Amino acid sequence: MRSQTASKTSMKPSSNSSAFSVRSSVAVSSHSAMVELKQRILTSLSRLGDRDTYQIAVDDLEKIVVSVPDSPEILPVLLHCLFDSSSDLKAPVKRESIRLLSFLCLSYTDLSFSQLAKIISHIVKRLKDADNGVRDACRDAIGSLSAQFLKEKEVENGNYVGSSLVGLFAKPLFEAMAEQNKSLQSGAAICMGKMIDSATEPPVAAFQKLCPRISKLLNSPNYITKASLLPVVGSLSQVGAIAPQSLESLLHSIHECLGCTNWVTRKAAADVLISLAVHSSSLVADKTDSTLTALEACRFDKIKPVRESLSEALNVWKNIAGKGESGTMDDQKDVSSEQCILERNGETDSVSCEEAGLVMQGSCDGLSSSSDSISKAVLILRKKAPRLTGKDLNPEFFQKLEKRGSGDMPVEVILPSRQKNSSNSNTEDESDANTSVLRSRSNGLCRTAGVHTKQRHFGDFAREKWVDERMNGGESRLRAFDGDHTEVIQADTSENRGNWPPLQRQLLHLERQQTHIMNMLQDFMGGSHDGMISLENRVRGLERIVEEMSREMSIQSGARGKATASWRSDVDGWDSPNYGPSSRNTQTSTRKIRGTGPSEQSGNSRRAWDKSSVAIRLGEGPSARSVWQASKDEATLEAIRVAGEDCGTSRNRRVSIPEAEAMMDEDDDNRGGQQGDPIWTCWSNSVHALRVGDTDSAFAEVLSTGDDHLLVKLMDKTGPVLDQLSSDMGNEAIHSIAQFLLDHTLYDICLSWIQQLLEVSVENGADFMGIPLELKKELLLNLHEALSTTDPPEDWEGLAPDHLLVELASNWNIEIQHFDT
């Protein structure tokens, strides 16, 4: 017995040690699995920075997230790896890490619920990133999380999960909006709008609590990006989450934004008013007066997109106020007063008036049937053709026509198909000309009033084409409004057929006069053209004579070497018409290009003096003046003037004339083999380099001359080509752009180049082209000064200049707050 007891006691510690060893082995294996999993994730994340392995790494990461076991211990490891990689220097790694955060939450909804606040806070912090792709990834991640978690799902205690989670999203976003960082404020506002739009079952009550905070931000002078926050109000309106108690303050803030100096903010305010009118019309129905007053005050904005949004907002708010319906009764009163005037003059047939009254009564019944038909009727009656009652075109002509005819004219009335009349058969024997002319007039006039008389037909004669086009456009709208098939009932009498021959004779007479005038005009134009060709040939002869004289004088004074300036001035203007009288009226900058010596600057100034001292206005020599004095015909004088202007722009063609080339070669030979004009040589080399696709050499040739006119012409000709330039040439071009920003006539060219500079900097990094810090600050400072003095062109389609300034400064990590001081 004692031995058995001893054996049992000896077995107990052995069993305990075996259990401990099993637990320790399991712990070691799980720890090794965690280490291996973390290593796989970090390896895949590091491969995201390479474009060749990017897609492979994305697939591997998604497989890892899907394949890991559903364990609470796994999620912290994944989140830790993704949080650390979000601060990586490479933009693709940061974008994919943020996307994987939302993908992880979608894959493990229950496990990630406890970590949701930490995940949202981390995503909001990433909004400070200068890369637009990272901020877009943050916006999409917030939208995915909102679609997954913001659902009106009731739990056991009667509360709703979606309503309680709105605070987790809104709190970090509002905190980000409170910071004095423009990109962070804008990104947070965009994320909040995405959160509201993406909610599957929007918790309206929780969303309504956001309105007071949003109104406070709109009224705050410290909140800069109001254009990004205003669409959030529109999103709240779309889901019906506008709090009635906050509506007054929101409208007041929106009205103030309509007068903002930033046109993007003004357009956003107009779009929000449209959204409120469409989705929250019941709330704003009794607050239309102040909004209409604000819209009327700024409806004539100088920016076209803003004007369009303001006009649309004004229309929808007028419809809510009920001011659009008054047009229907006013138009009906105008029609009734017209008929009464015609009845007093004895020119309206009683039967036609009765039928017209039936048509108007039927139309009024149709209008009262539904609100949709009322809105359609308002549009139709508003766009009807103007009444041609005042015969102010040619009163004597219409008086003669009235004396020839009687007061009875054929009248057509449009009736519904159920009121058919057998009188349709009476119109089949009428002539084709009579039927077509009568229907084209009476149909158009019956669509607006129902009945018109002969006098109105004659008043419509002079404006026949314009009225027919307007009426044809309104015919389809009228048919859609009536909804019934209509037919024309025509009552005609035989005694009225005698009224048409005089009218036809008048028409034929007018056609003959028009043909005669056209023939005279063609003869005159042909003679003028021949005279201009002859005059151009004579002027070219005069030019050749003047050039011969100039060449002989330059040969005689060749020892002094100053006669070549005339050739230099002409050659500079020959190459392109854009570098002549039609070029930009800018002053040549006297800036000194880096690397240019004082001798080159003195040569440039001497060349500019030579250009101004030998300017010759061709076409005004002694021969041209004698031709001018001898001519008495005004057309010939006009032709001489136009030919004289064309001579100034025809210098570019004279370069290709064989005689001019021979004269230049002969002049070069007489000068003893001297070199040609350096400006001409550099520009020719630049054009040749552009033709062969060597943009960098083209800019190098032009920049070596130090001539700003040539550089502006080349930049305008090629457009933004920073991605085709080397680092040295790119820095020279950027330096020139910084100088040109202070000239408002070159503002559009500079904006296009700065737009491309921002794009290539975002794509290739802030150190692209190795731009010096001083040059970056100079460009940003000049752009900041140009913002306060120059507005962007109306046809500018890129980013707003202030956005360009902020984006460039953010990309280059340069603080722009000190520019305002």
Swiss-Prot record:
Q: What does this protein do?
A: Plant-specific microtubule-associated protein (MAP) that regulates the orientation of cortical microtubules and the direction of organ growth.
Q: Which domain of life is it from?
A: Eukaryota
The molecular function terms of the Gene Ontology recorded here are:
microtubule binding
Q: Where in the cell is it found?
A: Cytoplasm, Cytoskeleton
List every stretch annotated Disordered: 416-437, 553-610
Q: Which residues form a coiled coil?
A: 501-554
Origin organism lineage: Eukaryota, Viridiplantae, Streptophyta, Embryophyta, Tracheophyta
- Report the residues modified as Phosphoserine: S406
Recorded hits in InterPro entries, A to Z, give: ARM-like, ARM-type_fold, TORTIFOLIA1/SINE1-2
Recite the UniProt keywords alphabetically: Coiled coil, Cytoplasm, Cytoskeleton, Microtubule, Phosphoprotein, Repeat
Gene Ontology CC? cytoplasm; microtubule
Designated name of the protein: TORTIFOLIA1-like protein 1
Sequence ranges of the HEAT repeats: 69-110, 114-151, 163-201, 205-242, 245-282
Q: Where is the composition biased (Polar residues)?
A: 579-590
Question: Would I find Hydrolase among this entry's keywords?
Answer: no
* Segment forming the signal sequence: none
Among Pfam families, the record links this protein to: TOR1L1_C, TOR1L1_N
Q: In which tissues is it expressed?
A: Expressed at low levels in roots, hypocotyls, stems, flowers, siliques, cotyledons, and leaves. Particularly present in hydathodes of cotyledons and root hairs.
Which effects follow disruption of this gene? Right-handed twisting of petioles when associated with SPR2 disruption.
